[in-house]
Amino acid sequence: MFGFIKKVLDFFGVDQSEDNPSETAVETTDVSTKIKTTDTTQEESSVKTKTVVPTQPGGSVKPETIAPDQQKKHQIKTETTTSTTKQKGPKVTLMDGHVKQYYFARRGETSTHDTSLPPPVKVLSGRSIPLKEIPFEATRNELVQIYLTSIDKLIKSNKLNSIPSQQIASHYLFLRSLANSETDGIKKNQILSLAKPLGTYLASKEPHVWKMINELIEKSEYPIIHYLKNNRAHSNFMLALIHEYHKEPLTKNQSAFVQKFRDSSVFLFPNPIYTAWLAHSYDEDSSFNPMFRERLSTNFYHSTLTDNLLLRTEPKEVTLSSEHHYKKEKGPIDSSFRYQMSSDRLLRIQGRTLLFSTPQNDVVAVKVQKKGEPKSTLEEEFEMADYLLKHQRRLDVHSKLPQPLGQYSVKKSEILEISRGSLDFERFKTLIDDSKDLEVYVYKAPQSYFTYLHDKNQDLEDLTASVKTNVHDLFVLLREGIVFPQLADIFHTHFGEDEREDKGRYQALVQLLNVLQFQLGRIDKWQKAVEYVNLRSSGLADLGDSLPITSLFTSSDFTKHYFSELLTGGYHPTFFDKSSGTANSLFTGKRRLFGNYLYLNTIAEYLLVIQLTLGSYGDKVTRDMMDKPKKEAVWRELANVMFTSCAEAIHIMTGIPQSRALTLLKQRANIEKHFRQTQFWMTPDYSKLDEDTLQMEQYSIYSGEPEYEFTDKLVSGVGLSVDGVHQDLGGYNRESPLRELEKLLYATVTLIEGTMQLDKEFFKQLEQVEKILSGEIKTDANSCFEAVAQLLDLARPGCHFQKRLVLSYYEEAKLKYPSAPTDAYDSRFQVVARTNAAITIQRFWREARKNLSEKSDIDSEKPESERTTDKRL
C-alpha cells in the first residue's frame, strides 16, 4: 500500500515535505555556544533534532509554537539555506548558525523563575502560617494508585456483573491506555494484568461492547480518548470506584483534589493522555461539552479544564537577554527638539494631548504630563515608539506607528494659554500635573491614530480591518515579549480599591486566580473602561503603557501590586495542622506557576478589551436604530468579528490555521447565543422592559441554561448600574451576564496552552522514538512499533505534517524490523498515507492551475505574434 502511494507521489513529482504552507520540517544544527536545556540542568551543543516548526510569513520561526522541550534549540529566526535528504525519512532543512537572530521570549519550561518569591504563607486571624507546598502531580499519582487498588478489590469481589458494561468498558480502556503510557515494564505488566479479567468478562458477557472496544484499540494506543470523545460519560468512573472500594479516609490534599476535579475522570489522566484528549475534545465529532457539569448544575467547569492543564506544566522559560533588540536598540531621546505650538493650528484636545494640524495632513501631538506621572513614563513611550518603528518590518507590525519627535519641558502657563479656547479645556486642566514646568512628549501620527476603535463614524468594514490590525499586533508583540497591561481601565469595582488584593482591577480569568470565584464578575462602568482605549483605527497606541514579558513571570512591581496573594499561594483552600503550626494545600503549587497563569490571563484580557470595544461601537451605532433586523445584523457581525479575533490569536500563538481555529472555537462557544447576549446586555434597551418580558427575553438568550439572576433595580435608560449613570455588565456583587464570552475566552486560552503542551509531549516521545531507532535504547520490535504508534496519538489533530513525519518513522521502523508483524498498526498508518497522498495531489493541481493562470495573464499582455498559444488545428 505504502509503495503504491509513493509511486503516485513520485509520478506527480511533488515535494512531500511542503503539503502545508504554514508548517515546515526542520533539522537543526545548533553550532552556538552551549545552551541550557529547559527541562534538565544538562548542557548540550551541536544538537540535531527532527521537528515540526510552524513558521511566520517570510519563514521566521515562531519560538513559542515549537514544542516546549525543544524550544531551547529554536530561539532563533532563521533562513533556510541547505537541504538534505535522509533515507526513508522526511525531507529536512539545515539552519545556518550564521544568520540566526535570538529571541528572548523562550517558550520552554524551567524548574523555577524567581528565587526571590516571597515565602508561601496563609494569613489566619492576622497570623502568617507557613504553607507546605504539595505538588499537583504527587496527589494525582496517589489517587491513581488508590484507583488501581480499588480495581483489584473489584475483581477479587466477583461483582463485575453488578456494574454497567459501559463503566467496565471505561475501566478497561483506561487501563489499556495507562499501560501504554507507562515506561516501566514491571508497572506496565501489572496494569495489563488488572485489565485482563475485565476484558475476559466483556468478551464473554457483552460481545457487542467488546467489539467496539477492539475497534478503538486498533485505532489508538490511548483508546480511552476516543471512547470518551464519542460517548458521553455520565459519571466520573474512577472516583465512583474509589468511593465504593477505598474504605480508608483520603488525605486532605486528596480530598481537595477530588472536590476540585470531581467532574471528569480525565483530570486524573497522565499528561500525554490528558493533553491528547483535550486537543481531540475540540473536534467536530466530539460529544464532550464543557459548558456544564455532568450533573447539569448551573456551575460552569470549562475553567477547571484550564486549571488542570496549567497545574501539569512547569514555569515557562522567559528571559530578557542584554543583547536582545529590546534591551540594546531603544534609541536616545531627542531633548533638543522644540515644536512651536500655536492656537491657530490647534485641532482639539484629546484627553491630555493637544492635537495640531500640519500641511501634510498629518497631526502633531503634544502629550502633556498628567498628575502624579513621573517623567520616565513619557520617556518609555518615546523609546517604545522608536523601537517599534526601527523593527516594524522584522516584527511584522501592521499598525501605523507614531513618529517620536522630541521630549522636553514646557511652562504650564504656555500650555494653558494655547489650549484655553478649546471646548475640552476645563477637563484638560484637571488631568495635567500641577507643576509649573511640565514634561511633554511630541510625536507625529496620521489622523486615524487619534480615532478610537469604537468610533461610530467607521463603517463595519473599516472597523473589522482595524480590529484585525490591533489583534495581530497585540499577539505578535506578545510573542516578541512585549506586554500591554493597560489597554483599558477595566475594574470589577471602584469601592475599597486599596484594601482589595487585586486593587479593584478586573481579572479576565478570575476563576484561575481566585479560588472563591466561579464565574467572571461584574464589570464596573464598562463603556467608561474603554472610553480612552489604547486601540485605534490605525492600530496600537500609547505604546509607553507596556512591560517586558519578564514582569509577568517574576515578583515584579506589577505582579506584587495586583497579584500579591498569588505570589504566596495563600489564597487557595488551606488545611491548618494545629500539631505543627503549619498549613498545607494542594494548590499552593500554583505559586511556582503564577507566570503561566498571568500569561494566559493577559491573552484573555486582550480579547476582553476587544469585546468591550466592539460592544461600545455596537451600542453607539445601533442605539437610535428603529429597524430591528438591521440592528441585529450589526450585532451579529460584531459577534463574528469577536470569534474571528480569538481564532486569529490562536493562529498567531500556535500556528493552527485561522479557519480551523474558528471551527474549533465554535465547538465550545455558541456564536448565536453570544450575539444575542451582547446585543441584550451591552445596550440600555433591556432597562425599558417589564419583568415578564425581561424573563422571556432571557429564555431566548440563555436557551438551555438558567436565566441571569440579579436583585438590583434597573435604572431607566441605563440598565444595571451601581452609580445610576453608567451601565455595568452585571449586577452588584454578581457575575457577568456574558456567559458565551466567558466560554469563548477559556476555549481560546485552553486551546493555545493545550496545543503547546501537546507539542511538548509529541517531541518528548519523538526523542524516545529516535533513540530506539538509532539503537541508543535497546528494545524489541513490538516496543518500537508501539512507541511510534504513541507518537501518532500525540500529533496535533488535523496537522497532517506531524502525522506524515510519524509515518516516516514508521517506515524506518519497518526497515529496522522487516520480519516483525505490523498488522496491528498498518491500518492506522494507511489512513495517514492516503490522506498525505490526497493532500499532495490536490496541492499539485492547485499549483498547476495557478501557474497556468499566471502564464495566461503574461501571454495576454504580449503582442499576438509573440503569444505561445497552440495554434494547431
UniProtKB/Swiss-Prot annotation:
Catalyzed reactions per annotation: L-glutamyl-[protein] + L-glutamate + ATP = gamma-L-glutamyl-L-glutamyl-[protein] + ADP + phosphate + H(+); (L-glutamyl)(n)-gamma-L-glutamyl-L-glutamyl-[protein] + L-glutamate + ATP = (L-glutamyl)(n+1)-gamma-L-glutamyl-L-glutamyl-[protein] + ADP + phosphate + H(+)
Cofactor: Mg(2+)
GO MF term list: cysteine-type peptidase activity; metal ion binding; nucleotide binding; protein-glutamic acid ligase activity, elongating; protein-glutamic acid ligase activity, initiating; transferase activity
Regulation: Glytamylation catalyzed by SidJ requires host calmodulin and can be regulated by intracellular changes in Ca2+ concentrations. Also requires ATP.
Start-end of Polar residues biased regions: 22-58
Uppermost EC category: ligase
Domain of life, per lineage: Bacteria
EC number: 6.-.-.-
Gene Ontology annotations of biological process type: proteolysis
Keywords: Hydrolase, Ligase, Magnesium, Metal-binding, Multifunctional enzyme, NAD, Nucleotide-binding, Protease, Thiol protease, Transferase, Virulence
Binding site for Mg(2+): D542, D545
Positions of region (Disordered): 16-90, 851-873
Known role: Glutamylase that mediates the covalent attachment of glutamate moieties to SdeA on one of the catalytic residues that is required for its mono-ADP-ribosyltransferase activity. In turn, inhibits SdeA ubiquitinating activity. Also glutamylates related SdeB, SdeC and SidE. Glutamylase activity only occurs in the host since it requires host calmodulin. May also reverse the SdeA-mediated substrate ubiquitination by cleaving the phosphodiester bond that links phosphoribosylated ubiquitin to protein substrates via its deubiquitinase activity.
Subunit structure: Interacts with host calmodulin/CALM1; this interaction is required for glutamylase activity.
This protein's name: Calmodulin-dependent glutamylase SidJ
The organism of origin for this protein: Legionella pneumophila subsp. pneumophila (strain Philadelphia 1 / ATCC 33152 / DSM 7513)
Gene responsible for this protein: sidJ
